[in-house]
Amino acid sequence: MAKKPSYIGLLNAIANGERGGYELFKAWSDTTDDPLLKPVLDMIAVREMEHSWAFEKRLTELGFSLRPAASKDLKKQVRFLKSDASDEEKFASFGVGGKTLAKSDVPQEDGLLQILADRTIDPQTGALMGRFISEERDTGRQLIKAHRALVRRTQAVK
């Protein structure tokens, strides 16, 4: 058997993190009363789960299996997103709103390119990571856009 690639732990962490992301966005989607926000949350939830499956698949292609990780923080956040808290409060729990709303057009360092810092990553894994980075950034843009729309709708009602 070939030597274990240095990035196996990273693939495992991403797969677990994205599975948790699915749980978060699905919980929020299931509880929002906003018919315009729900499809955005559903798209993000599906994207998160697809990322989890893609990274788990890559692990198996490399001869390894996913090591599931439990998180008390995840369970706590899922409970919050299933609660009757407002969508505005739920956006805030993801760091969207307030100051983020005003500065959302300014490119900010997100650290995602650090994922590709390992020069031993094979081309297939690198391509998967590149797509992941692009889609994660798009998810951030979609959340900011959805938040702005929510704020506009809320202000129009007042």
Language-model features: locations:
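Non-heme di-metal
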Residues: A2-K158
